[in-house]
């Protein structure tokens, strides 16, 4: 008979609010169930997609007899780091040309944020980070556990289902000088609401005037508009003024490498000399955390980014994914219009990227799960990438019923 465990007093932890949606979905035997919780792209048939260019890159790596499985340096694959910085900042970026960027390979977006957060907690004079309200559910946990104090700034206006720009400016305007500010580079998660370029410029001016430190999270480059350059405009605006910033990048969404955990943290510094020292300190954060990053996913990304034909093939496939999501938005909007669902649903086609913040409340979300077997997070966020022409009528029926029966 097993003896009593020293961990017997542990409480059962709750499911993750996002990943827990899939756990519940998997337990549901219904043939009409739809999972709109997790941000992973699905084909029109509802299947996970591996990009053709990714399969080709993997095959090339497998067929290369000189390829080995040795440890990478603490900072990761050098080619991957250079190409990642170039992708987000632009090939002609002055920061890159002047060697002012320290880039390290990390474990996708989450790992990049955590390494950046721990670096700031150790080496930056201000320990407070302002994050948008709402934001991705993991952001506050990542930064709190990294040793930072988390505050929020207004971002989303439920009344307009758009940006609360005035509230954003007021909150950042009253933040202490030098505070860190988390910014979603594009396709804000969970709202799908982004500032215009004019608004970005006002945000930049305000932040630089108060010496607020930008920390960008770029999880969807190319996925919002279908253009890699267009989706990086906000970031490049901040780099162009010569100021410093942090940038967390992920290839989970735009290359479909969810399970490979491929990402990068770049810190744009004031000089090349500072960048060298920053990199040396990033190594001291990474080494006791996970020693060094995995080789396979980064090799796939580097193979694609350094070959012009493969890069072009990737941009075509990426635009195809972005365009399908835009089409899903239009189809859902049209379906609700046809049903004469109460309310204004134009925000569905105005918002961009993988997610739509529907405006549905938690009771309506629970009703749709119970009655229609539709799974989403309790805040009403749906992953447009999980929809198809086949499932849209079912979702529209569910939304119509929820809005009609529950206020």
Curated annotation (Swiss-Prot):
Q: Where does L-aspartate bind?
A: 39, 136, 189, 381
* The UniProt record lists the keyword Cytoplasm: yes
Q: Please indicate if the UniProt record lists Lipoprotein as a keyword.
A: no
Major location category of this protein = cytoplasm
One GO CC term on file: cytoplasm
List the catalysed reactions: L-aspartate + 2-oxoglutarate = oxaloacetate + L-glutamate
Q: Which cell locations does it reside in? A: Cytoplasm
- In this UniProt entry, the residues modified to N6-(pyridoxal phosphate)lysine are 253
In terms of InterPro entries, this protein maps to: Aminotransferase_I/II_large, Asp_trans, NHTrfase_class1_PyrdxlP-BS, PyrdxlP-dep_Trfase, PyrdxlP-dep_Trfase_major, PyrdxlP-dep_Trfase_small
Q: Which cofactor does it need?
A: pyridoxal 5'-phosphate
A single Gene Ontology molecular function, please?
A: L-aspartate:2-oxoglutarate aminotransferase activity
Q: Which family does it belong to?
A: Belongs to the class-I pyridoxal-phosphate-dependent aminotransferase family.
> Subunit arrangement?
Homodimer.
The remark listed among the other comments is:
In eukaryotes there are cytoplasmic, mitochondrial and chloroplastic isozymes.
Q: Function of this protein? A: Important for the metabolism of amino acids and Krebs-cycle related organic acids. In plants, it is involved in nitrogen metabolism and in aspects of carbon and energy metabolism.
Protein name (Swiss-Prot/TrEMBL): Aspartate aminotransferase, cytoplasmic
| Organism of derivation | Oryza sativa subsp. japonica (Rice)
């Amino acid at each position: 008979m097993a003896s009593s465990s020293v961990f017997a007093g542990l409480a059962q932890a709750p499911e993750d609010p996002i990943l827990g949606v899939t756990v519940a979905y998997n337990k549901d035997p219904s043939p009409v169930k739809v999972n709109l919780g997790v941000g992973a792209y699905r084909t029109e048939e509802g299947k996970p997609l591996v990009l053709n260019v990714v399969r080709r890159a993997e095959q090339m790596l497998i067929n290369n007899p000189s390829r080995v499985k040795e440890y990478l340096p603490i900072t990761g694959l050098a080619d991957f780091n250079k190409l990642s910085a170039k992708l987000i900042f632009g090939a002609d970026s002055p920061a890159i040309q002047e060697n002012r960027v320290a880039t390290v390979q990390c474990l996708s977006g989450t790992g990049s944020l955590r390494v950046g957060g721990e670096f700031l907690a150790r080496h930056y004079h201000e320990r407070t980070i302002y994050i948008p309200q709402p934001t991705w559910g993991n952001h506050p946990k990542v930064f709190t556990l990294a040793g930072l104090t988390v505050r929020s700034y207004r971002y989303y206006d439920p009344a307009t289902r758009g940006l609360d720009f005035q509230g954003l400016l007021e909150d950042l305007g009253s933040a202490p000088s030098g505070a860190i500010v988390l910014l979603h580079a594009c396709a804000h998660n969970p709202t799908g609401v982004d500032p215009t370029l004019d608004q970005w410029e006002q945000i930049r001016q305000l932040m630089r005037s108060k010496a607020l430190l930008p920390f960008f999270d770029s999880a969807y480059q190319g996925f919002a508009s279908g253009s890699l350059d267009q989706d990086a405009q906000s970031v490049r605006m901040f780099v162009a003024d010569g100021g410093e910033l942090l940038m967390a990048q992920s290839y989970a969404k735009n290359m479909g490498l969810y399970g490979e955990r491929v990402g990068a943290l770049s810190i744009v510094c004031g000089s090349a000399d500072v960048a060298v020292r920053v990199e040396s300190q990033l190594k001291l954060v990474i080494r006791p955390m996970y020693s060094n990053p995995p080789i396979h996913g980064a090799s796939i990304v580097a193979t694609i980014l350094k070959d012009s034909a493969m890069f072009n093939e990737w941009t075509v496939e990426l635009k195809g994914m972005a365009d399908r999501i835009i089409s899903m938005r239009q189809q859902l909007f049209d379906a609700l219009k046809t049903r004469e669902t109460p309310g204004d649903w134009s925000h569905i086609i105005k918002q961009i990227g993988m997610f739509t913040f529907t405006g549905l409340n938690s009771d309506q979300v629970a009703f749709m799960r119970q009655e229609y077997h539709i799974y989403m997070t309790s805040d009403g966020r749906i992953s447009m990438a999980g929809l198809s022409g086949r499932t849209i009528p079912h979702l529209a029926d569910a939304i119509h019923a929820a809005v009609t029966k529950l206020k």
